[in-house]
């Protein structure tokens, strides 16, 4: 039987292992888009444990007979001008260990995270998933998510001859244009 519970500091190794696996999975799917660092487990585990004391975040684990077999990390977020969305709950990570996929752990993690988000006053939940991750997309659609955005990525070679200048603010002077330059 799989139960969902809040993560604890004692889960750090399992969280790190699954976070590292998630990073490798994304990088393998598109190494130009997703980063890969050597031995991400320790850092990922520390980061997720740091979220346990953040009142705007929740990290839940799927526990099967005392063994952590998956996790979800969600947060409460405000308005995002960058993403053109209102306040929402955001599911940053969800991962279930391969041997237990299909046994309901992912669905149970999602339901508990969504309940936590609702209890924190948000009426919308947002997440991203890889374009080619059909299993995850089917899980999300089955829980009631709908597709709203598609990320597009273009890889370009930087041009060494182009210097990017920051835009000036009103009333600011550029080099050679200020009172000290006259």
Feature names for model-found ranges:
Residues 107, 119, 131-149:
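Conserved active-site alpha-helix within GNAT-family acetyltransferase domains
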Residues 61, 67-76, 90, 95:
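Conserved beta-strand in the GNAT
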Residues 1-13, 158-182:
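Conserved N-terminal entry element of GNAT/NAT acetyltransferase domains
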Residues 20-47:
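Conserved GNAT-fold acetyl-CoA-binding loop/helix
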Residues 118-128:
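Conserved GNAT acetyl-CoA-binding A-motif
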Residues 46-60, 90:
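A short helix-loop-beta-strand connector motif used in the catalytic cores of GNAT acetyltransferases and
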Residues 127-136, 153-158:
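Conserved beta-strand-loop-alpha-helix junction that forms the acyl-donor binding cleft
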Residues 100, 104-112:
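Conserved acetyl-CoA pyrophosphate-binding loop and the N-cap/start of the following alpha-helix
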């Amino acid at each position: 039987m799989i139960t969902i519970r809040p993560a604890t500091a004692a889960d750090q190794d399992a969280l790190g292992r699954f976070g590292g696996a998630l990073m490798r999975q994304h990088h393998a799917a598109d190494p130009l888009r997703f980063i890969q660092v050597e031995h991400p487990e320790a850092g990922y585990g520390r980061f997720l444990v740091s979220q346990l004391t953040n009142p705007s975040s929740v990290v839940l684990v799927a526990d099967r007979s005392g063994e952590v077999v998956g996790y979800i990390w969600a947060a409460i977020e405000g308005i995002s001008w960058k993403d053109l969305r209102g306040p929402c709950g955001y599911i940053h990570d969800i991962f279930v260990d391969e041997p237990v996929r299909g046994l309901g752990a992912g669905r149970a993690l999602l339901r508990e995270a969504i309940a936590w988000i609702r209890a924190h006053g948000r009426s919308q939940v947002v997440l991203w998933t890889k374009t080619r991750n059909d299993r995850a997309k089917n899980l999300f659609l089955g829980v009631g998510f709908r597709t709203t955005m598609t990320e597009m990525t273009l890889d370009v070679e930087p041009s060494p001859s182009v210097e990017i200048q920051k835009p000036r603010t009103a009333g600011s002077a550029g080099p050679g244009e200020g009172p000290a330059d006259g």
